[in-house]
Amino acid sequence: MAFEKNNEPFPLHFVLFPFMAQGHMIPMVDIARLLAQRGVLITIVTTPHNAARFKNVLNRAIESGLPINLVQVKFPYQEAGLQEGQENMDLLTTMEQITSFFKAVNLLKEPVQNLIEEMSPRPSCLISDMCLSYTSEIAKKFKIPKILFHGMGCFCLLCVNVLRKNREILDNLKSDKEYFIVPYFPDRVEFTRPQVPVETYVPAGWKEILEDMVEADKTSYGVIVNSFQELEPAYAKDFKEARSGKAWTIGPVSLCNKVGVDKAERGNKSDIDQDECLEWLDSKEPGSVLYVCLGSICNLPLSQLLELGLGLEESQRPFIWVIRGWEKYKELVEWFSESGFEDRIQDRGLLIKGWSPQMLILSHPSVGGFLTHCGWNSTLEGITAGLPMLTWPLFADQFCNEKLVVQILKVGVSAEVKEVMKWGEEEKIGVLVDKEGVKKAVEELMGESDDAKERRRRAKELGESAHKAVEEGGSSHSNITFLLQDIMQLAQSNN
């Protein structure tokens, strides 16, 4: 793959710090490749276990001539009271482990600081995940501009920005069931308090961690967003203004994965043979398959997963159902075989136990809809593939993303999930959508009503504008140029 040479007196050197969770790492590796294609020297700093997950994709990028360097730092699991190898969020099972994980992450400050000190050429810019607040201190110490990456879209980022400045709105609510309207917003949008990713109830041991993140956000030089202007124009404009002009939409970054093998291995090697998967899809009618995936950190209880399975079966439509974190669901595996579910659906249902080649599946012509947890990466991949979505948010920014997809973009059908899946309280929450609810929502999404046809038309249109945004002359391609010019001017004035 050719990359554009930087005809500047010295090359820019960006150091990237991905947070160790799949939804954060995947787009950051894509960003590394996008910047390297523009002639920027890239160093990615991560831990051994996480480096292994991206080895194949990065090796292919490096072999194609892209200037990417991967540096590994030892993960201090012992000091934080974790097991060896627990280096990624999807390997944690309790809230206590997550607290310990953040403790371990912040212990990386010293070894990383030593790395930066000895780096040559000197870094021109740090791009850090929002969860790695320690990088702010390093940026300050070495006087390097730090760009923040949140992994969210402009709609959600603006919502968080507005609510942090108007916190009394959340404080004055009488209960977690009461809805409020987000003020100063381009559209009338309502949420309950738990549905927005703003720090309201802070669990024990988290106050300092969250305060550090908010402070790191405030002191960063700017923000890059995995979105594109044409998707959420009013929100991109308002968010850029809120960040004094230093916000660049450069997505969908997943579109840097142009070859099949990169699409298939994006994030983690798949647990299904790529050819087997494509063969199954090839045997189905165009637009007939529903792809079902609730993300890498799905915490639905067994009772809810059974209802989802039965609803998919009763919909009588072909589907692919991805269940990640398979080890956690031993009872589900037993139910699949003992209840005869697997036998009954074998002709029209494909179960993927573990990782799936998501981008490859979504871009296949047989797929006509996407049942998603509305994580931002998945939402954007659905949009990029031009697919209407059935939305089933769990937590974090996912209720915000659902609102964008269903209410603003009008390319989604809601499964009508109103309650946030709190870690450790899943069983207590129980079933939120029964099999009838699942069947009804699938029919609404995949059926032939006028509304369904209009959703498909709009989704296809958005998919086309996503591809145009990253092409030369497109809004996201141009924004990368503006970002590089900004950092180059800064580097020259500092010299």
From Swiss-Prot:
Residues 449-475 are annotated as: Disordered. GO terms for cellular component: endoplasmic reticulum. One of its GO terms (biological process) is flavonol biosynthetic process. InterPro entries: UDP_glucos_trans (IPR002213), UDP_glycos_trans_CS (IPR035595). Its EC number is 2.4.1.-. Keywords: Glycosyltransferase, Transferase. PROSITE patterns: UDPGT. Pfam families: UDPGT. Expressed in leaves and flowers, and at a very low level in roots. It comes from the Eukaryota. UDP-alpha-D-glucose binds at residues 296, 356-358, 373-381, 395-398. GO terms for molecular function: quercetin 3-O-glucosyltransferase activity; quercetin 4'-O-glucosyltransferase activity; quercetin 7-O-glucosyltransferase activity; UDP-glucosyltransferase activity. The keyword Aminoacyl-tRNA synthetase does not apply. Residues 450-471 have a biased composition (Basic and acidic residues). Acts as a UDP-glucose:flavonol-3-O-glycoside-7-O-glucosyltransferase. 6- and 7-hydroxyflavone, but not 3- or 5-hydroxyflavone are accepted as substrates. Possesses low quercetin 3-O-glucosyltransferase, 7-O-glucosyltransferase and 4'-O-glucosyltransferase activities in vitro. Belongs to the UDP-glycosyltransferase family. This is UDP-glycosyltransferase 73C6. It comes from Arabidopsis thaliana.
